[in-house]
């Protein structure tokens, strides 16, 4: 299988604190007229959002502007949250089929849809959008399986693949899959600043009304939106860009805004009480892993790595790192994202077993390890000392260093022999397939390390991952079974510490209805719900 694993590290540094604090609002609709003290009168929703805008180009977009993009643009399909009655919600494609071998995917394109610039959407517009994504998207690698794409008539798009792949999941990606007006694509091809002028060319429920860089984004309901059942809830969404979580909390509790996407986790309960609201939790795609440097003794011995895995106080890490809003990981695949399975074994906190394994491996007196974590990640700063203290109880001294993520990442890639012994990583898949992403990116063998910073190489694991990747589009249950076997190998060989999956945490103000958070779009705030609020 030809898999590209050069995944961009979007937000690995700058956006991480926001992602840890409070998840974006998954969807909202107005509460009863006059309910509470929220200012949602006259069809205006005010929001304090942590999301910055790195680009308004929907093709190049690969960062926190996803919060806005999902309201302006649409993909072929939306991937629904775990537990939904249907796996997908049709968007630009009203239906789709795949051949038995998973090599041909046919999408029936919705008629009567217009782009915000007045152009009509048809199959050719879809083809041009995906070809642009293949060529220059920030997440262009998601289209690696695509060999060719064609419009066989005005309403039919056919994709031909190099190997069986889950194009439904790819087509529902939050990055690299937006359908864009051909007129705007042509204009941006000759002017790379075209979109930065405040132009938008989507089909979504909102248009970009105005943008004050670093300060404010105003979205306006699109009058000709095709989906009458999911028409924009608000006429205007007025968003203040507020990177500081404490400031956002103050704006919310002072009723300067109706909703805040970022509130410090330690204050969640107090904020909910002040707002007469509720705290809601859900799956998120955010997963914490601790790489072992498997090239250097004593971590080249699986028994040593297993011992250290038993010496991690997992629940304490969750309680201290994310205020209890998390669950112990079943490997590096986050809960709710394919191919997550609770059949994958977990290590328990067992210091006696850890000591016995170390002694059996010839290290009864312990040793010293160097651990690094991202200095810009507040959760890591809170939970890493717990790892140090626990390892000390089995005679392992840990020297901890906080570094900017990109600095430690570059060092680990360029000089494995002298890199850290343990590297704490915060990771999430680009789209809703953590088999082709997490399991590949984090632990698949490679000649030159990019993101497999354990440097672990295992031909049997690689074969399972590669095989599963070619089955996901044609036989997902078979792919799942192979991925579970591969994750069992990760447990047994322990090239990393599988710490925890962070949860999405939302404060729901009393005057707003909030649909369930969608872990497939963690950086996107939908102001018109994909599914009705419960």
Where are these regions (language model features)?
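A bilobed periplasmic-binding-protein/Venus flytrap-type ligand-binding module shared by bacterial periplasmic
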Residues: 79-80, 220-224, 284-307, 311, ...
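Ligand-site clamp/hinge motif
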Residues: 223-270
């Amino acid at each position: 299988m030809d898999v590209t694993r050069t995944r961009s590290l979007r937000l690995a540094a700058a956006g991480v604190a926001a992602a840890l604090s409070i998840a974006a609002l998954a969807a909202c609709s107005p509460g009863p007229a006059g309910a509470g003290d929220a200012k949602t009168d006259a069809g205006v929703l005010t929001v304090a959002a942590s999301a910055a805008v790195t680009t308004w180009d929907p093709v190049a977009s690969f960062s926190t502007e996803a919060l806005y993009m999902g309201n302006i643009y649409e993909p072929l399909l939306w991937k629904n949250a775990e537990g939904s009655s249907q796996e997908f919600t049709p968007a630009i494609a009203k239906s789709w089929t795949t051949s038995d071998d998973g090599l041909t995917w046919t999408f029936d394109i919705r008629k009567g849809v217009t782009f915000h610039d007045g152009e009509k959407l048809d199959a050719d517009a879809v083809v041009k959008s995906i070809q642009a994504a293949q060529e220059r998207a920030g997440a262009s690698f998601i289209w690696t399986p695509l060999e060719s794409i064609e419009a066989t008539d005005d309403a039919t798009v056919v994709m031909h693949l190099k190997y069986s792949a889950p194009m439904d999941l790819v087509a529902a990606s939050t990055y690299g899959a937006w359908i864009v007006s051909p007129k705007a694509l042509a204009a941006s091809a000759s002017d790379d600043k075209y979109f930065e002028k405040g132009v938008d060319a989507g089909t979504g429920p909102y248009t970009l009304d105005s943008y004050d860089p670093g300060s404010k984004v105003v979205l306006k309901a699109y009058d000709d939106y095709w989906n009458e059942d999911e028409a924009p809830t608000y006429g205007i969404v007025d968003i203040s860009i507020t990177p500081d979580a404490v400031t956002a909390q103050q704006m919310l509790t002072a009723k300067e805004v109706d909703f805040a996407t970022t509130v410090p986790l330690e204050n969640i309960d107090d904020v909910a009480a002040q707002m007469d609201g509720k705290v809601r939790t859900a799956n998120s795609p955010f997963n914490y892993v601790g790489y072992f440097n498997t090239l250097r003794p004593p971590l080249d011995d699986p028994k040593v790595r297993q011992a250290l895995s038993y010496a991690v106080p997992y629940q304490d890490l969750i309680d201290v790192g994310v205020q209890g809003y998390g669950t112990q990981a079943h490997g590096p695949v986050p809960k709710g994202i394919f191919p997550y399975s609770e059949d994958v074994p977990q290590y328990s906190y067992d210091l006696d077993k850890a000591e016995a394994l170390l002694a059996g491996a010839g290290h009864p007196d312990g040793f010293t390890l160097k651990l690094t974590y991202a200095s810009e990640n507040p959760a890591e700063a809170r939970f890493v000392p717990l790892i140090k203290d626990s390892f000390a109880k089995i005679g392992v001294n840990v020297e901890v260093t906080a570094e900017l993520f990109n600095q430690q990442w570059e060092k680990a890639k360029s000089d494995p022999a002298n890199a850290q012994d343990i590297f704490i990583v915060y990771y999430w898949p680009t789209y809703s397939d953590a088999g082709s992403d997490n399991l590949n990116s984090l632990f698949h063998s490679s000649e030159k390390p990019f993101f497999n910073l354990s440097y672990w190489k295992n031909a049997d694991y690689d074969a399972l991952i590669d095989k599963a990747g070619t089955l996901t589009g044609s036989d997902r249950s078979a792919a799942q079974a192979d991925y579970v076997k591969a994750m069992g190998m990760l447990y047994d060989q322990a090239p990393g510490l599988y710490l925890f999956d962070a949860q999405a945490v939302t404060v729901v103000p009393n005057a707003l209805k909030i649909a369930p958070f969608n872990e497939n779009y963690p950086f996107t705030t939908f102001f018109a719900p994909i599914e009705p609020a419960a």
